[in-house]
Amino acid sequence: MPRVNRVYEPDRAQLLHTFSHLSEGIIPEFQIRFRTNCRPFEHPVVREKFFEFFDRAFAYYRGIDLVDYAIQPNHIHLAILTNPAPIPLEEVAQVHAQLRDEVLNPEDPCDRERLVKIEEDMHNYSLLMKQVTGPFGQWFMRELESKRDADIYCPVWCRRFGCTHLLSAKAAVQGMAYIEMNPLRHRPLGEPPVATYEAWTLMWGAKHERCEKGFKRLAQIIYHGYKVEEAERLLIRELERTVGRSIEETRRRRQEMIENGLDPNRPVTGCIDLNHPGGCPVFRRGFAIGEFQDLEDFSRRHWGRPVQPDRVCVSVDGSGLCSLVSPRGIGTERRC
């Protein structure tokens, strides 16, 4: 396994503010910052590759729904929805401390009732942890079960993530970022590493000179420490394996679009509009027309369903409706 560049390891997650939405409730916006003096997203190819990664990552976080995000040179803004606040970590640690310090007699009806209640609480807590935070939750539960000591609960969390409320929105985002921010550093639930799907389509749809330079740079960043030729070979193999299609086929499909009078590099805007009367932020992201056929295949493969027709702008003259494609399908059609 190649050594991964440490620039992708986040430094902290910070809650910026929350804004209200009539139908969705309170939506917190977070900022995930990276290491000091590190600006990994200045490179456009690296920045674009994380668009696909965030869509993919939040697809299996059942308790955390990604509303929108904006990527800056050295930090990421996230607007998310979470389930109601679950059990704080302090309460879990307190229950276990009581169980450890007090001698409970299973033969005593009162003690037996307390033991049953504690077991139920911990079982529900374990299920909730796995549901809300997905692979990260399963990793954390394994950490706790391996120690079997209530004293390490809070210290482990505080030392690693700087937060004491295990399942709060901030803690969940911080944990997700730490464990799964780097696509090649962690493989969620047996899935292959997250390939740079949109970066791949953007690179091979761009002008040849910029495409080749961007691909070499991306390969060097992901497969840090390898020679350039070996890094390119590994990246191409990973892309072909994950997307299930060869780069030559994508080149051919884009050439067919050009022959039919379409520009595969023409940008269109996908947007999200929460219709908040107070004027909540509207983030924008760009697509190229040539991406939509690939995007439908990708959506069917990873989300289990094709992209909804009313969620994708396929207009060539710019007069069509467009909306951000997301796992939750959030977005309102609007004229671009």
Regions found by a protein language model. Name each.
Residues 1-73, 81-336:
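Short Pro-Cys-Gly-centered "Cys-loop" motif that presents a nucleophilic cysteine in a tight turn
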